Amino acid sequence: MVIGCCSLRFYLHGNNSLKGKRRVVRAIKDRLKNDFNVSIAEVGNQDVLQSLHIGISAVSSDKPYMDGLMTKVINAIDKINLADIVDYKTEILSMSTDNY
């Protein structure tokens, strides 16, 4: 089993309301859920209006597929162009299922 995790931090230019931040989060979530089979959650900076931190995860049986999926997800978010990606980190974890 291969687990892909990605942590992304964004800067929201000109945002001054929680409503505006939620709109950006919802747009990113909706786009990714429609295009990719991933789970998404806002994981930090929830009280900072111009900062957004989301986590994305997916599970597969193939490491090369997972590497490609995480790259495609990051590129798709960048193309949405609702916020600037300040930083991101991707990890691919392998878990043995032989003992089950």
Question: Which sequence ranges carry the predicted segments?
Answer:
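Structural beta->alpha junctions
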Residues: L12-N16, V59-D62
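A short linear hydrophobic-aromatic micro-motif
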Residues: V38-G44, V86-D87
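C-terminal structural segments of small proteins and small subunits
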Residues: D62-Y100
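C-terminal binding/interaction regions
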Residues: K21
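Short glycine-/aliphatic-rich beta-strand segments at the starts of folded cytosolic domains
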Residues: G4-G14
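Short, charge-patterned binding micro-sites
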Residues: I3, A41-S61, S94
